[in-house]
């Protein structure tokens, strides 16, 4: 690039393309794999890596004490994510593996597997084609810190580590009633999860080593080792209480596994706030603009500014304002495009509200190349909206605004002269709210990765939810 032609302006299409196709993340992943494997032919290695297209497959480790439900959660995750479940038992039962035969023979004599053999079994399994294509979920492995370090040294790094915990008394009670289906491998319980089918009931088997004393010994051993394993995964670890319904544990685990970790990729926020009249879109946009320097784009305000500036767009808009008619979408999109193609929007990002209001407008916005990368729907019930808006008043003398409940006028004299904006009438608000919710279903379907935020709470609490949704990567879709 010629330095004499500075300052250089990067076309907005370039960062948009990089963001849409995850170019930065792809290059980062390739560099990581090159450093881990150090191939003699890097070009061929990168071509093979790209053809696999497996950067986003699940790589999960689930740990927990006996009877914490880790195997059940791992099996459910496997089914939901279409991945591969890997347990110590499945590694020992593998056919056509010399290591499995050796490990099984050792286990039958000593009831344990040496760290080096277990890690070699894990490496052999994870390098097979199905694990490379679909990912893997390790159930109860690693068992010791030494195993965790050996696995990391081989470059087999999980993306998410889940640790289940519960009080020992609960775990002992659970373990005593555990039963296993020898056909499917599903785990049941005599009290908490008894199968309704008589056929399954009749074939259930009681596993060995589940007495109270044996369970207590296993718990002691687990607690001794887990505190040394956890420091190996400081940034990808999530602890979940398993002393709750299994479905709730699974939901929390699935939500975490589908979430992405923060990346170093350049990110320019392009935020769209949707919500009914009085949902707080304007306030949230102002807060985002103040904290992160985003350009606050209010569709209605842009149209008013164009008319006030007597621009070419303003001359087109003014007749519609005078007749109190809706400005055509074609004019609105041109005004928006003129604002959003300016350098401050390209460099800093933007937060848009007031547009789109229906599916056609959303498609028009996308066709112009201004597709938001974060969409938030502020959900507020009608009663709260009416309370917020119908009680607003304005002092015609000072221009000061009041709210009869939250900011009442200081004196009776001021209260008597207060006026209400016609747009704050109950009839108008109900009409506008009904119009929004009539179109919101199509918008939510169009922006299928939108985040729904409860807007009926303190505005700074709402802001924290929106801020979290912008800073953290969006959850990945399950294909």
UniProtKB/Swiss-Prot annotation:
<feature type="binding site">
    <location>
        <position position="147"/>
    </location>
    <ligand>
        <name>AMP 1</name>
    </ligand>
</feature>
<feature type="binding site">
    <location>
        <begin position="325"/>
        <end position="327"/>
    </location>
    <ligand>
        <name>AMP 2</name>
    </ligand>
</feature>
<dbReference type="Pfam" id="PF00406">
    <property type="entry name" value="ADK"/>
</dbReference>
<comment type="subunit">
    <text>Interacts with CFAP45 and CFAP52; CFAP45 and AK8 dimerization may create a cavity at the interface of the dimer that can accommodate AMP.</text>
</comment>
<keyword id="KW-0963">Cytoplasm</keyword>
<keyword id="KW-0067">ATP-binding</keyword>
<feature type="binding site">
    <location>
        <position position="361"/>
    </location>
    <ligand>
        <name>AMP 2</name>
    </ligand>
</feature>
<feature type="region of interest" description="NMP 2">
    <location>
        <begin position="298"/>
        <end position="327"/>
    </location>
</feature>
<feature type="region of interest" description="LID 2">
    <location>
        <begin position="391"/>
        <end position="424"/>
    </location>
</feature>
<keyword id="KW-0418">Kinase</keyword>
<dbReference type="GO" id="GO:0004017">
    <property type="term" value="F:adenylate kinase activity"/>
</dbReference>
<dbReference type="GO" id="GO:0004127">
    <property type="term" value="F:(d)CMP kinase activity"/>
</dbReference>
<dbReference type="InterPro" id="IPR027417">
    <property type="entry name" value="P-loop_NTPase"/>
</dbReference>
<keyword id="KW-0966">Cell projection</keyword>
<feature type="binding site">
    <location>
        <position position="392"/>
    </location>
    <ligand>
        <name>ATP 2</name>
    </ligand>
</feature>
<dbReference type="GO" id="GO:0021591">
    <property type="term" value="P:ventricular system development"/>
</dbReference>
<feature type="region of interest" description="Adenylate kinase 2">
    <location>
        <begin position="269"/>
        <end position="471"/>
    </location>
</feature>
<feature type="region of interest" description="Adenylate kinase 1">
    <location>
        <begin position="58"/>
        <end position="258"/>
    </location>
</feature>
<dbReference type="GO" id="GO:0005524">
    <property type="term" value="F:ATP binding"/>
</dbReference>
<keyword id="KW-0547">Nucleotide-binding</keyword>
<feature type="binding site">
    <location>
        <begin position="354"/>
        <end position="357"/>
    </location>
    <ligand>
        <name>AMP 2</name>
    </ligand>
</feature>
<protein>
    <recommendedName>
        <fullName>Adenylate kinase 8</fullName>
        <ecNumber>2.7.4.3</ecNumber>
        <ecNumber>2.7.4.6</ecNumber>
    </recommendedName>
</protein>
<feature type="region of interest" description="LID 1">
    <location>
        <begin position="177"/>
        <end position="206"/>
    </location>
</feature>
<dbReference type="GO" id="GO:0004550">
    <property type="term" value="F:nucleoside diphosphate kinase activity"/>
</dbReference>
<dbReference type="GO" id="GO:0005829">
    <property type="term" value="C:cytosol"/>
</dbReference>
<feature type="binding site">
    <location>
        <begin position="67"/>
        <end position="72"/>
    </location>
    <ligand>
        <name>ATP 1</name>
    </ligand>
</feature>
<feature type="region of interest" description="NMP 1">
    <location>
        <begin position="87"/>
        <end position="113"/>
    </location>
</feature>
<comment type="function">
    <text>Nucleoside monophosphate (NMP) kinase that catalyzes the reversible transfer of the terminal phosphate group between nucleoside triphosphates and monophosphates. Has highest activity toward AMP, and weaker activity toward dAMP, CMP and dCMP. Also displays broad nucleoside diphosphate kinase activity.</text>
</comment>
<keyword id="KW-0808">Transferase</keyword>
<comment type="similarity">
    <text>Belongs to the adenylate kinase family.</text>
</comment>
<dbReference type="GO" id="GO:0016208">
    <property type="term" value="F:AMP binding"/>
</dbReference>
<feature type="binding site">
    <location>
        <begin position="140"/>
        <end position="143"/>
    </location>
    <ligand>
        <name>AMP 1</name>
    </ligand>
</feature>
<dbReference type="GO" id="GO:0036126">
    <property type="term" value="C:sperm flagellum"/>
</dbReference>
<dbReference type="GO" id="GO:0005930">
    <property type="term" value="C:axoneme"/>
</dbReference>
<dbReference type="InterPro" id="IPR000850">
    <property type="entry name" value="Adenylat/UMP-CMP_kin"/>
</dbReference>
<feature type="binding site">
    <location>
        <position position="203"/>
    </location>
    <ligand>
        <name>AMP 1</name>
    </ligand>
</feature>
<dbReference type="InterPro" id="IPR036193">
    <property type="entry name" value="ADK_active_lid_dom_sf"/>
</dbReference>
<keyword id="KW-0206">Cytoskeleton</keyword>
<feature type="binding site">
    <location>
        <begin position="278"/>
        <end position="283"/>
    </location>
    <ligand>
        <name>ATP 2</name>
    </ligand>
</feature>
């Amino acid at each position: 690039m010629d330095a004499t032609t500075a300052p250089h302006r990067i076309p907005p299409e370039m960062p948009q393309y990089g963001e849409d196709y995850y170019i930065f993340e792809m290059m980062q992943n390739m560099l990581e794999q090159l450093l881990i494997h150090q191939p003699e032919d890097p070009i061929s290695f990168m071509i093979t890596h790209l053809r696999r297209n497996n950067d986003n497959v699940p790589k999960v480790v689930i740990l927990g004490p006996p009877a914490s439900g880790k195997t059940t959660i791992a099996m459910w995750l496997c089914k939901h994510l279409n991945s591969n479940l890997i347990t110590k038992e499945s590694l020992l039962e593998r056919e056509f593996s010399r290591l499995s035969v050796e490990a099984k023979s050792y286990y039958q004599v000593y009831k344990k597997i040496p760290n080096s053999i277990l890690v070699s079994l894990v490496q052999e399994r994870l390098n097979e084609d199905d694990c490379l294509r679909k990912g893997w979920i390790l159930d109860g492995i690693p068992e010791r810190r030494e195993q965790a370090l050996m696995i990391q040294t081989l470059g087999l790094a999980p993306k998410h580590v889940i640790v289940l915990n519960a009080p020992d008394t609960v775990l002992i009670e659970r373990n005593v009633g555990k039963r296993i289906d020898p056909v499917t491998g599903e785990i049941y319980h005599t009290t908490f999860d008894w199968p309704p089918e008589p056929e399954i009931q009749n074939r259930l088997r009681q596993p060995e080593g589940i007495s109270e004393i044996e369970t207590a010994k296993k718990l002691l051993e687990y607690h001794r080792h887990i505190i040394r394993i956890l420091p190996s995964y400081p940034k990808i670890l999530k602890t979940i209480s398993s002393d709750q319904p299994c479905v709730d544990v699974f939901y929390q685990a699935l939500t975490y596994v589908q979430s992405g970790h923060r990346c170093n990729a350049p990110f320019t926020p392009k935020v769209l706030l949707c919500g009914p009249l009085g949902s707080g879109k304007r306030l949230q946009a102002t807060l985002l603009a103040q904290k992160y320097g985003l350009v606050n784009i209010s569709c209605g305000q842009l149209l008013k500014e164009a008319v006030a500036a007597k621009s070419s767009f303003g001359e087109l808009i003014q007749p519609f304002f005078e007749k109190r008619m809706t400005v055509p979408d074609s004019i609105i999109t041109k005004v928006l495009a003129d604002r959003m193609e300016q350098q401050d929007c390209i460099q800093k990002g933007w937060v848009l509200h007031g547009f789109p209001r229906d599916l056609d407008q959303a498609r028009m916005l996308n066709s112009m190349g201004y597709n938001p990368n974060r969409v938030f729907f502020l959900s507020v019930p009608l009663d709260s909206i009416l309370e917020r808006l119908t009680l607003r008043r304005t002092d015609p003398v000072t221009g000061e605004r009041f709210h009869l409940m939250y900011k009442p006028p200081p004196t009776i004299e001021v209260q008597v002269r207060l006026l209400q904006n016609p747009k704050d009438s109950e009839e108008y608000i109900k009409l506008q709210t009904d119009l929004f919710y009539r179109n919101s279903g199509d918008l939510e379907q169009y922006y299928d990765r939108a985040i729904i935020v409860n807007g009926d709470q303190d505005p700074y609490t709402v802001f924290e939810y929106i801020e979290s949704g912008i800073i953290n990567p969006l959850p990945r879709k399950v294909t």
